[in-house]
């Protein structure tokens, strides 16, 4: 049975711009993870997105596109996650590209499939932070304030704490979790071991596991039981 995103506990994030062989992809899709999020910071094209979608669709797992550019948007996903980078220094990453997208696709958009994410990028060395000019030197109370804004002002369904390749601060994740009631807390970044997954699982509604898939698929698979226990 496919779970709605509100019920996801564990998600794998697959990058269309990275190579993954068929056996590893099958292991990921059949693993018991709750969903697959397709997205990346660079090199994401319509071609490689479509290729990855077609390969994932051989399996019954729920599949969402995290939109990183307008060119790679294609029908066929269960959900379309749209990041609004709350700590970006550039308005285009907060609402500008969103305006362009709605201007172009508004009449044909299915709003039931669209999931807005308040995105807070925490790793200054990540591609995502550079791309979006994210202000990452934030005190915990800054991040908590962004979380409150995302839930109570913007009423987005998801607040995504993105550490993008480095392991974050479990205490901050706990603090954020304590102020969110309706908005779901997604945590992504640097989870490579069972122990790291276990540290974040009590606080994040959804734990996102990405990069380790491409280095050690068995380590990636081991995070599922750690999150769901």
Curated annotation (Swiss-Prot):
InterPro entries: GGGP/HepGP_synthase_I (IPR039074), GGGP/HepGP_synthase_sf (IPR038597), GGGP_HepGP_synthase (IPR008205). SUPFAM superfamilies: FMN-linked oxidoreductases (SSF51395). Pathway: Membrane lipid metabolism; glycerophospholipid metabolism. Keywords: Lipid biosynthesis, Lipid metabolism, Magnesium, Metal-binding, Phospholipid biosynthesis, Phospholipid metabolism, Transferase. Its cofactor is Mg(2+). It comes from the Bacteria. CDD domains: PcrB_like (cd02812). Belongs to the GGGP/HepGP synthase family. Group I subfamily. This is Heptaprenylglyceryl phosphate synthase. It comes from Halalkalibacterium halodurans (strain ATCC BAA-125 / DSM 18197 / FERM 7344 / JCM 9153 / C-125). The gene is pcrB.
């Amino acid at each position: 049975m496919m779970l709605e995103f509100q019920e996801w506990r564990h998600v794998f994030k697959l990058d269309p711009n990275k190579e993954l062989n068929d056996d590893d992809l099958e292991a990921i899709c059949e693993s018991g993870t709750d969903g697959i999020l397709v997205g990346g910071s660079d090199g994401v094209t319509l071609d490689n997105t479509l290729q990855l979608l077609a390969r994932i669709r051989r399996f019954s797992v729920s599949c969402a596109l995290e939109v990183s550019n307008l060119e790679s948007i294609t029908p066929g996903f269960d959900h379309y996650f749209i990041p609004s980078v709350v700590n970006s220094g550039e308005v285009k990453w907060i609402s500008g590209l969103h305006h362009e997208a709605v201007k172009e696709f508004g009449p044909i958009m299915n709003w039931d499939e669209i999931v807005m994410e308040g995105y807070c990028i925490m790793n200054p060395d990540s591609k995502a932070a550079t791309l979006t000019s994210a202000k990452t030197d934030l005190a915990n109370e800054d991040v908590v304030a962004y979380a409150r804004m995302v839930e109570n002002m913007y009423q987005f369904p998801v607040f995504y704490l993105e550490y993008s390749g480095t392991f974050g601060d479990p205490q901050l994740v706990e603090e954020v979790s304590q102020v969110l009631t309706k908005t779901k807390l997604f945590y992504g970044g640097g989870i490579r071991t069972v122990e790291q997954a276990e540290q974040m699982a009590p606080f994040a509604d959804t734990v996102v596991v990405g990069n380790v898939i491409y280095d050690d698929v068995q380590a990636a698979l081991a995070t599922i039981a750690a999150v769901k226990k």
